[in-house]
A protein has these predicted regions:
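Short beta-strand scaffold segments in enzyme catalytic cores
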Residues: 21-25
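Unchanged
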Residues: 50-73, 80-138
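Long, compositionally biased, intrinsically disordered
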Residues: 9-12
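Short, surface-exposed coil-to-beta transition loops
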Residues: 18-20, 95
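Conserved Nudix-box catalytic region and its N-terminal flanking loop in Nudix hydrolases
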Residues: 26-65
């Protein structure tokens, strides 16, 4: 991971710039986090946009794949960008994503993805997969009070 990250938030950008979707999620008032099979850390559901895919569809697909969400309400919050080398960006150039919020009311009984498990937490975790990015996205969502 790089040492320096620059995070910015936007109301909107050109659609073709949006490469990722991240979905801050809650269920029954608890934060929803995923634990990847190959990591000992927790992360917010999210992932890459597929060719020709609407970015909001990316958000819904990633939420379902990574959490097993069956019933949920999801809405876009804002566009974010990260500048700096990360696990998913080796160029260090500014990359853009759609930040969404979801309230999940029902989960599938098992996951069929790279995630080992889904964990519901009262507090935010200490061991983040993306510690310099995802906590700031949640902080921004909390500041906007968009529930």
């Amino acid at each position: 991971l790089g040492d320096v990250y620059k995070r910015q938030f936007y109301d909107t950008v050109n659609d073709e710039l949006l490469k990722f979707a991240v979905i801050i999620s809650q269920s029954n008032g608890k934060w929803v986090f995923c634990k990847h099979k190959e990591r000992d850390t927790y992360e917010v559901p999210g992932g890459h946009r597929e060719d020709g895919e609407d970015i909001f569809e990316t958000a819904k697909r990633e939420l379902q794949e990574e959490t097993g969400a069956i019933k949920f309400e999801i809405k876009p919050i804002c566009v974010y960008s990260v500048t700096g080398k990360t696990r998913v960006n080796d160029t260090g150039k500014e990359t853009f994503g759609l930040l969404c919020f979801a309230e999940i009311t029902e989960f599938a009984t098992e996951l069929h993805s790279e995630m080992e498990k889904v964990v519901l937490m009262n507090e935010l975790p200490e061991n983040w997969t993306y510690p310099l990015i995802q906590p700031k996205l949640i902080e921004n969502k909390e500041n906007l009070k968009l529930y």
